C-alpha cells in the first residue's frame, strides 16, 4: 500500500533586517533545507517559507544613522538576504517580510481575539527614558556599571562579565546607548499578555513530544520559577505596527515576529490560489507545522508563541526543531580574527555545497553547538566529496565513454553488492527524517568506501589493457557508475548543485524510488569535472576578506580608548582587596547558562567555587584545568541561580570571546598573596 503524502509547512527563524546573513545563520537554513528536500524526495507536499523580521528599535535607529527611512533599509536588506539564501540553494517557496499587509492584519486579528478572550491586561510601568531623543529605552539600549560585580559598560539586562541578570533601573550610572544622555524614569501604560493563564496547557504541550527532551527540561525550569505576564507593547517612536485603538502604542517586535510565519504563508496562498490558509493554521488543522529555530529563541517559541496561538483559536506547532550555535576554530565567531564570515563573502570564494556538506556531517537532532574548524572543513570536503564520491565517477566514466560509446552494460556485474547499497535506503531515510544528517552521512561514506574498494579490487585500468576482456571492463565500470548513482541519490538533499551536474552527466533524474532499478543499457554523457577540490588558500583569502569587511572605521581604538582608566582610589581602598594565586582544579559548563563556567579553585589548603562569565572565550573548559590564575579571595560570597560564587577570577579584555585569564609567573604557588 502506497504511503499517503503528508502536507507539511516548514519555517526557519526570521533573520533580523538590520544586518547581513553570516555562517552562524546558515546552519539553521541549511539544516531545514536538507530536511525539506528529503521530504520532497519522499513524495510529501512541503511548503517552505521564511521572512525578514523587520520591526523594532534597532532597525529604526540604524535607519536614522544611515539617513534613510526604515522601509528603504529593510527592502535593501531583504534583497541581500534573499540573494544569500539563493546562493546556498535554500529552496524557499516564499520569502516575505513582517512589515507587510498580511502580517499587520493577522497581528491585529490575534491581538483582538486575545483581548476579547480576556488575555490582555493593562498596567502602568516605570521605564528609563532618553530626554534628548524623546524615547523610552529598551534594555539593550541602556549601558552602565554592573550592580553586582561593578564591571563598566554592561547592558541593561545582564552582565557579560559576571553573568548576573537585572533590570536596567539597577544599573549604576546608566547612560542611553543612543545619545549618551543620563536617562530619567517615566511612567507609561503598557499592555500585557496573560501568559500564566496558559501554564497548564503549556506544561502538557511541553511533554507531548513537540519538543526535544533538552528543550522540555529547560522549559520545566521556567515553569518551576513561575510564568510572568508578557509586555507586548512599546511606546512611540517605534518602527512597527500601531496597536488598534491605542494611538502611540506599538506591538513589541516579538509579538508580530512569529506571526510573520503566518503572514508569509498567507502571502504564498494569495499568490498561488490553490492553497488553503486554514488547512495549515486553523484550530483543527491536520497538517504538520515545523519550526526550525536556534536555542537562543526557545523562550519565545516554546512559551509565548503556542500560548498566543491557543488564545486566539489557531493551531499550535507540531514540533520545534532546535539547534545549537556555530563556533569557528573552537571559538566564538570573531570580527578581529576574520571568522565572523558573511554568507555573501563565503560565496565569493567557495562552493555552497561544501558548507552544506560539512554542516550536514556534523548535525544531529540534539541542540549541541557545531564547530566549523576550517582546516577540518577543507580536509573533510576534499576527502569525502572529491576523493570518495566524485572520484568514483571519474574512475569509471572515461572507459564507458571511450570504449563503449557512453553506454552502460545491460547487466549488473555484482547484483548482491548493488542490493547492499539499495538496502541502506531505509536506515539513511530514517536518519534524514529524524534530522540525524550526520548519521546519514556516515553511512553514505561507509558505502562510498565499499564502492571504491570494489573498483580498486577489480582494477579496470589493468583490465583495459588486457586483450579480450572488454566485457569485463564494461561490467566493472558500469557497476561503478551505478554505485555512484545510488550514493548521489542519497546525497541529493545535501548537495543540490553537485546533484544537478550529476543528473546531467548520468542523463537521468535522481529519485529515491528509482534506485531499486539500476541503469542498464543506459547512455550517459561525456564526463566533465563535477566538483572542484577546496584550496586552503581560498579559505585563507575568505578569512582575510572578512577581517577587511568588518574592519572598524577610522576611529582610534585600543584598550584605553575602549575602556578608560577609572577614578583614582586611595591606597587604603586598594589594600582592602585580597588577591591570591589559585590553581584551577576543575572547570565545567554550567547547565542552563550560555555564558558561565564553574571553576573549582585550590588556594593552598582551601577550595573555592566560582562562577565566571568566560565561557565564550574558553569553549573547552578542560583546557583550563591545571592552570594557575589570580583571584579576588575576600569578595563576599554571592548567591546565583546556579549556586554560590566565592570570589572572582581576574581577566583582561573587552568581553565575549576576547577575555584572557591572568596567569602568574613560574614559581608562584596556590594561596600566595598578590602584592
Curated annotation (Swiss-Prot):
It comes from the Bacteria. Its cofactor is Zn(2+). It is found in: Cytoplasm. Residues 573-675 form the tRNA-binding domain. Gene3D superfamilies: HUPs, Isoleucyl-tRNA Synthetase, Domain 1, Methionyl-tRNA synthetase, Zn-domain, Nucleic acid-binding proteins. InterPro entries: aa-tRNA-synth_I_CS, Anticodon_Met, Met-tRNA-synth_bsu_C, Met-tRNA_ligase_1, Met-tRNA_synth, Methionyl/Leucyl_tRNA_Synth, MetRS_core, MetRS_Zn. The keyword Ligase applies. Coiled coil: none annotated. Zn(2+) binds at residues 146, 149, 159, 162. A motif ('HIGH' region) lies at residues 15-25. Signal peptide: none annotated. ATP binds at residue 335. Pfam families: Anticodon_3, tRNA-synt_1g, tRNA_bind. GO terms for molecular function: ATP binding; metal ion binding; methionine-tRNA ligase activity; tRNA binding. Homodimer. Belongs to the class-I aminoacyl-tRNA synthetase family. MetG type 1 subfamily. This is Methionine--tRNA ligase. It comes from Yersinia pseudotuberculosis serotype IB (strain PB1/+).
Amino acid at each position: 500500500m502506497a504511503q499517503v503524502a503528508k502536507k507539511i509547512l516548514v519555517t526557519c527563524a526570521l533573520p533580523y533586517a538590520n544586518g547581513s546573513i553570516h555562517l552562524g545563520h546558515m546552519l539553521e537554513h541549511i539544516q531545514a533545507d536538507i530536511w525539506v528536500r528529503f521530504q520532497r524526495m519522499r513524495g510529501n507536499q512541503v511548503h517552505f517559507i521564511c521572512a525578514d523580521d523587520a520591526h523594532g528599535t534597532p532597525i529604526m535607529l540604524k535607519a536614522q544613522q544611515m539617513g534613510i527611512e526604515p522601509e528603504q533599509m529593510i527592502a535593501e536588506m531583504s534583497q541581500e538576504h534573499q540573494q544569500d539564501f539563493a546562493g546556498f540553494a535554500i529552496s524557499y517557496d516564499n520569502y516575505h517580510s513582517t512589515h507587510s499587509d498580511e502580517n499587520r492584519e493577522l497581528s491585529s486579528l490575534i491581538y483582538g481575539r486575545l483581548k476579547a478572550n480576556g488575555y490582555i491586561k493593562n498596567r502602568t510601568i516605570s521605564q528609563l527614558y532618553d530626554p534628548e531623543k524623546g524615547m523610552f529605552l529598551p534594555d539593550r539600549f541602556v549601558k552602565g556599571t554592573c550592580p553586582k560585580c561593578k564591571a563598566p559598560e554592561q547592558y541593561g539586562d545582564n552582565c557579560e562579565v559576571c553573568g548576573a541578570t537585572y533590570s536596567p533601573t539597577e544599573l549604576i550610572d546608566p547612560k542611553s546607548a543612543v545619545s549618551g544622555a543620563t536617562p530619567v524614569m517615566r511612567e507609561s501604560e503598557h499592555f500585557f499578555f496573560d501568559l500564566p493563564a496558559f501554564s497548564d496547557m503549556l506544561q502538557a504541550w511541553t511533554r507531548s513530544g513537540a519538543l526535544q527532551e533538552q528543550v522540555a527540561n529547560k522549559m520545566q525550569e521556567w515553569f518551576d520559577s513561575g510564568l510572568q505576564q508578557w509586555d507586548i507593547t512599546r511606546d512611540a517612536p517605534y518602527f512597527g505596527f500601531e496597536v488598534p485603538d491605542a494611538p502611540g502604542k506599538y506591538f513589541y517586535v516579538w509579538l508580530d515576529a512569529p506571526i510573520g510565519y503566518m503572514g508569509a504563508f498567507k502571502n504564498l496562498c494569495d499568490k498561488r490560489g490553490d492553497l488553503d490558509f486554514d488547512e495549515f493554521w486553523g484550530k483543527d488543522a491536520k497538517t504538520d507545522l515545523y519550526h526550525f529555530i536556534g536555542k537562543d529563541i526557545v523562550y519565545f517559541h516554546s512559551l509565548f508563541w503556542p500560548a498566543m496561538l491557543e488564545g486566539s483559536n489557531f493551531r499550535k506547532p507540531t514540533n520545534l526543531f532546535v539547534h545549537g550555535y556555530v563556533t569557528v576554530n573552537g571559538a566564538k565567531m570573531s570580527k578581529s580574527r576574520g571568522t565572523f564570515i558573511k554568507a555573501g563573502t563565503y560565496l565569493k570564494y567557495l562552493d555552497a555545497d561544501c558548507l552544506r556538506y560539512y554542516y550536514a556531517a556534523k548535525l544531529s537532532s540534539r541542540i549541541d553547538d557545531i564547530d566549523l574548524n576550517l582546516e577540518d572543513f577543507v580536509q573533510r570536503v576534499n576527502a569525502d566529496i572529491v576523493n570518495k564520491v566524485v572520484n568514483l565517477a571519474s574512475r569509471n566514466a572515461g572507459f564507458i565513454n571511450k570504449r563503449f560509446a557512453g553506454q552502460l552494460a545491460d547487466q549488473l556485474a555484482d547484483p548482491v553488492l548493488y542490493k547492499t547499497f539499495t538496502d541502506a535506503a531505509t536506515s539513511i531515510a530514517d536518519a534524514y527524517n529524524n534530522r540525524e544528517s550526520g548519521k546519514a552521512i556516515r553511512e553514505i561514506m561507509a558505502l562510498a568506501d565499499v564502492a571504491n574498494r570494489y573498483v580498486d579490487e577489480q582494477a579496470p585500468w589493468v583490465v583495459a589493457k588486457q586483450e579480450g576482456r572488454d566485457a569485463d571492463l564494461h561490467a566493472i565500470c558500469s557497476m561503478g557508475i551505478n554505485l555512484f548513482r545510488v550514493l548521489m541519490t542519497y546525497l541529493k538533499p545535501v548537495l543540490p548543485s553537485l546533484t544537478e551536474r550529476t543528473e546531467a552527466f548520468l542523463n537521468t533524474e535522481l529519485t529515491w524510488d528509482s534506485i531499486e532499478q539500476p541503469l542498464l543499457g543506459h547512455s550517459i554523457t561525456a564526463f566533465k569535472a563535477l566538483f572542484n577540490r577546496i584550496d586552503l588558500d581560498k579559505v585563507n583569502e575568505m578569512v582575510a576578506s572578512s577581517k577587511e569587511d568588518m574592519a572598524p572605521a577610522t576611529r582610534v581604538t585600543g584598550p584605553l580608548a575602549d575602556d578608560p582608566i577609572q577614578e583614582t582610589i586611595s591606597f587604603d581602598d586598594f589594600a582592602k582587596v585580597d588577591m591570591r594565586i589559585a590553581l584551577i582544579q576543575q572547570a565545567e559548563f554550567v547547565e542552563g547558562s550560555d555564558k558561565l563556567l564553574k571553576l573549582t579553585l585550590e588556594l593552598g589548603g582551601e577550595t573555592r567555587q566560582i562562577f565566571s562569565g568566560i565561557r565564550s572565550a574558553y569553549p573547552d573548559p578542560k583546557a583550563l584545568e591545571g592552570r594557575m590564575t589570580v583571584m579576588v579571595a575576600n569578595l563576599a560570597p554571592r548567591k546565583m541561580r546556579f549556586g554560590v560564587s566565592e570570589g572572582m577570577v581576574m581577566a583582561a579584555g573587552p568581553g565575549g570571546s576576547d577575555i584572557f585569564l591572568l596567569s602568574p609567573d613560574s614559581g608562584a604557588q596556590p594561596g600566595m598573596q598578590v602584592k
